A protein has these predicted regions:
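Conserved phosphate-binding/catalytic loops in two-lobed NTP-binding clefts
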Residues: 142-154
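Glycine-centered flexible beta-alpha turn that most often forms the glycine-rich phosphate-binding loop
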Residues: 120
Length: 223
């Protein structure tokens, strides 16, 4: 087992890289208001907005980080993974739910310790709905803040999982939760449409992929 690895991804936006998504009719048709097209969880969402970039993280054992004097930004305390979908581009409810439950069991923490969830929600009608149902079922009786940073960045495709861990870690370090932009209609989840200023030390991040591959990370601030 490696003590230290560099992990992450990069995504270039061009007709070839996003063609498969277009073939699945996954894109938003809101061309007259592109700034409002990415609207995860909102009732009027109609598809995702593609974007790209690059994100890298150093993942290593605590002993390795201390030995080389690295600033430790956060610790992964829980991980869940499941493979279950109803369609190549549509996750069902059971798969994401099992991924969430597995990560929480692995972390060994109570539900109310998780103050923020960075959802996978890409602004698609069925995908967002099923993820919301999975979160609501797992966190029944608890109301952590839930947002999707894709409302601000669009869907960064293959790099989204890595970048969203970075975004969430920056929020945790700087004591705020970024808003879920373009969210207008009410929902069962606790989704803030405005920035929330608050301290929190544990967050959960979902990344769900084609074919029903579902992963969940729980990350804690190192004090």
């Amino acid at each position: 087992m490696q003590d230290c690895i560099l992990c992450g991804a990069a995504q270039e936006v061009n007709p070839f890289s996003v063609g498969s998504f277009d073939g699945l009719s996954a894109f938003s048709n809101r061309e007259t208001e592109p700034q409002k097209a990415s609207r995860p969880f909102d009732k009027s969402r109609d598809g995702l907005v593609p974007s790209g970039g690059g994100a890298s993280l150093v993942l290593e054992s605590y002993e390795s980080a201390v030995k080389r004097g690295a600033p430790i930004l956060a610790e992964i305390i829980g991980y869940g993974f499941s493979s279950n979908g109803d369609h190549i581009s549509v996750p069902n409810i059971d798969g994401p739910k099992r991924s969430l439950e597995m990560a929480i069991r692995n972390a060994g923490i109570a539900l109310d310790e998780i103050k923020y969830i960075n959802a996978h929600a890409t602004s698609t009608p069925i995908g967002d709905l099923n993820e919301a149902k999975a979160i609501a079922e797992v966190f029944e009786g608890h109301r952590p803040y839930v947002t999707s940073t894709k409302s601000m960045t669009g869907h960064e495709m293959w790099m989204a999982g890595a970048s969203e861990v970075i975004y969430s870690t920056l929020m945790m370090q700087n004591n705020f939760i970024a808003p879920n932009l373009n969210f207008e209609a009410s929902a069962q989840l606790n989704i803030p449409a405005q920035r929330v200023n608050m301290e929190f030390d544990t967050f959960l991040s979902n990344s769900f992929g084609f074919g029903g591959t579902n992963s969940t990370l729980i990350i804690k601030k190192v004090k």
